[in-house]
Amino acid sequence: MYPSTLPAEADPSTMNGSSVAEPPDFQAATAAAAAAARASSLEQDEWSVGECGFLDPDVQRTMRSGSAAEDITQYPMHGWVDVTKEFHDACAELQPGELAQDMLFGLFEAMSAIEIMDPKMDVGMGFDKQDLPPPSFEAAIATGAIKLDDLTPSELIGIYDALFSCLVSWLEGNSMDQVLFTCLYLHAPAQIKDKALRVFCTAVRNLIVVIKKIIAVAAVNEEEDFQLYGNSALLAAEKAQPATVYSSLKDVEDELIRKCKKLTSTEDWMAVVHRLRFMRHLFQVIYHVEQMASNDTVDDKVDIYKILLVASEMLPGIRNTLDRGTQPEKGSDAPNPMGFSPRIHDRSQPPAFPRSIKIRDRPSSYQFLEEMISRFKYACKVTKYKDYYSALNFFIEYSKKSGQCILSRSVLQTLFSANMRMAHGKLPMKQFLRHSVQVFNSPPVLNAKHPVAADPKVQQHLENFFRYCINMNTFTQFIRICGFNRARQRDKLARLIENFDTIQVDAARLDSMMNQLANERAMEGNEPMATALKHSTHFSTWVLYNCFRAMLIFLMSGFELELYAVHEFLYIYWYPYEFLIGFLVSALTRTENILLAQEEYAEHQSKTQSGGSGAAKNRKAAKPKKNKKTQRPYRAEIVFYHALLSLCGGMYKAMGALTKDGRVRLPLSKFDNEEIRYNRRFLPFATLTSPPPVSYAEFKNVREHMMRHSVEDLYTYAAKHFDQARNVLESIQNPDQEMLDLLQIARTNFVVMNVLARGHQKEVKRQPEFDFSKHSYFPIIKLK
């Protein structure tokens, strides 16, 4: 049934002079009503009822007769028409999977229509007309559905476990009202007489407030991660006092322990104590993290790590006593038989929450909490990383391990920098970046002991550069982006890469000024200062390295998110093989060479100074150090990038061979424009001056040159690349799990390419399977 809108014949005197603002696209009937409202000399019969042909004929006759005029109390008036037959006839013209689209029926309306009356999406489908309204807290007390005092250990354990399950379901992105506040005890904990239950429910309410604050301050959540807002009135009923929760939980624990000493069988009560103790430690950790946003000390982080160790040790014992609590009833949505009303807030939810919620089961909820605590412990290690290079590496690695847990990602952001202007809570970000450049490639101008550091002109240029870096927020935003979920990271990296161009220009300008100052000091006869400033590319190298990393993460994340079609793999692997990884290796190699040159210059200066002093002649000559280790801090990373370079080369040549061999399904030419797809994939790189954008014509020329080789040669070339990657990875000492996975991929693909080069399955042109289960960026090629 569709409503039809009719402009009622209203008195012109009441409508004259009224202002009606209309959007550019609106219904014809509404347009007629708006025109009637704006016209000052409009006759009543100018808009005839007959023009509104979609109205039911009976309604039209009634309107013409004027008998309904006295009954009109609302403007406009709706006449309902049964369009079921017409609707079914129109739908018969659509093929399965097709959607109708109209100016008034777009994708939003289509998705709403699909979800309506689907039991998995439409929460209203779970109701029957005979269902009684879900009981409120007061109604449940009146009917005796819940107990407020003298709860047994089994009942307490069941409620505790159910609340932990609801907490985990909330952290997974579900509505707070539909999971946590289905527990009636959370609505008014002050009315609960049982102290163990009252204190636990109060702790949960305060935990909700603290978690919401941490996530809001960290600001790395999106709508699919976490529902930050809920029914605030439920939380406002009792004022949150997080500072008193810890002592209250400890008092209840002590009382129950004293009670256990008087009992013969204590297993059930000790299971209650363990859950209270775990809640106390969990709350203490999260509350400390929230407080560190304003008062950050290293001691707090050490305390947090110790508390996390205790909490993680308690979880195995709790999981072993899950069967001691009351269990959910079969066929019921409630996580516990007593104290929960799953549908209490369904009718009060806004349209944004139409779906039915399935609360996690208890074993998997405690598994989630155990993994979350492990991530918290890992996040505490961020305090060891005092420069941007190592901190960024840690954030990238943590992003891969944190998964979809928004609280874990928010805790890391808070531990590192709750304020974007401060690193580790107390170090100004400008000073942090300055120290990071010094650690990365040690520019002499940043060395306080070097004479060039006293030059006011040099310091002014440095101050302007780092102030510009802070104002642009590019480097701080790069770290913050690593806190978002993996899908959102790619979208935000695309915008971040565009910002690097202006900083690259500023860094190049700074290096140029340093070289200019070097020439001026040389003309003045100040050779030491001129040598320190000459050929300075420190700042450009640092900026370019971080830009290249952002580009590589952006490009390769498309494989993890399954955004690329198989026929696109060719140019996706080609770009890092031909350009990006080579740029990264070049930047790191140049940095190492700078460090080596500075080391040699320092040794030369030391020998010159010691050789000229008389005291040095009387001392015994120092023995030369054997096998002196030179500064090569980036050697391991360079070797790893060489392995990635060979893997990208192998995949690029393999995709070329498979395409030429007819084993890759290509889109139909009339539906395909490869140039458009290519430009869209590399669109964020188009604004950069370094590296310069690579046009589709350049890629096409390179591909045509490669495709001149025979299929067998291309398979052989791909096998050689995979073999090179295997050799590089096998040479790495103490490889981590990622390197071992890449080694297995290189070995397997090497064998597959050799098999295809010898003509295996030459007559069967099936597209191979690309298995990304081992690694997100590089697949194992499997022949079918």
Curated annotation (Swiss-Prot):
Q: Where is the composition biased (Basic residues)?
A: 617-630
Provide the family line: Belongs to the MAK10 family.
Note the PANTHER family from the entry: GLUCOSE REPRESSIBLE PROTEIN MAK10 (PTHR21373), N-ALPHA-ACETYLTRANSFERASE 35, NATC AUXILIARY SUBUNIT (PTHR21373:SF0)
Q: Name one GO cellular component term.
A: cytoplasm
State what this protein does.
Auxillary component of the N-terminal acetyltransferase C (NatC) complex which catalyzes acetylation of N-terminal methionine residues.
Q: Which Pfam families match?
A: Mak10 (PF04112)
Q: Which organism is it from?
A: Drosophila melanogaster (Fruit fly)
User: Subunit structure of this entry?
Assistant: Component of the N-terminal acetyltransferase C (NatC) complex, which is composed of Naa35, Sbat/Naa38 and Naa30A.
Q: Where is this region: Disordered?
A: 1-23, 320-353, 606-630
| Biological processes annotated in GO | negative regulation of apoptotic process
Protein location: Cytoplasm
**Which UniProt keyword terms apply here?**
Cytoplasm
Give yes or no: UniProt keyword Protein biosynthesis: no
* Keyword Cytoplasm attached: yes
Protein name from the UniProt record:
N-alpha-acetyltransferase 35, NatC auxiliary subunit homolog
Q: Which InterPro entries does the entry link to?
A: Naa35/Mak10
Taxonomically, the superkingdom here is Eukaryota
